[in-house]
């Protein structure tokens, strides 16, 4: 047992000189990594859908507000709630990652050496199956700007999903809304990895060597804004023809 404990102490002693132990990350890099990793992004998506599970929020206590405002004002208020909820959700996620890693991280606007190696080298991907994509963003984007882009794109995608769920649930069943949202999320990954024809989406990720052909962040944000405007217009049109009830048998 004495020899076993000696081996264990020696192994712990190697931590002091290991670059994996003492090399710090930038505080925003975990959030950037989470936003670009498929399984973590999907878990965040599921959490957001759970937040909007009761869309279009027509419970009895909330429906009394229709007595004091028009249907258009009611819809605008609900959409403002969805947008602000998305902002709180993703800002909270950013804050949690920053606080969790802050004891062993720095705040400078420069990429850390470990994260740079994970992104730019193939050794981590081949040995540990850890990948961060796309590779081309790191040389041209600062960490602070990358964190802002990740937050903005998450917010755009979250509002798109929340407003689409609101529209579908307003006109149909909640099961249909979740089915449509889940299908579009899965299809987006199939398109990204070439399981569907490229012409279906301009966002097809067709390999690291061709990442330069992907749309810019500005174009992606404009795309989200366009689809959000279309969905909002459809909601404003649909709400005029939907039966909204405060109590059973009472139509507003």
State what each model feature region is.
Residues 86, 180-181:
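Hydrophobic alpha-helical transmembrane segments of polytopic
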Residues 51-67:
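Transmembrane helix boundary and interhelical loop/hinge segments in multi-pass membrane proteins
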Residues 78, 181-182:
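Residue-level recognition of transmembrane alpha-helices
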Residues 14, 63, 81:
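Active-site micro-motifs of SAM-dependent methyltransferase domains
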Residues 24-55, 79-166, 170, 203-225:
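Secretory targeting signals
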Residues 1-56, 148, 170-171, 175, ...:
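Hydrophobic alpha-helical transmembrane segments
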Residues 70-72, 172-178:
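Membrane-helix interface segments
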Residues 70-81:
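Amphipathic cytosolic juxtamembrane alpha-helices at the membrane-cytosol interface
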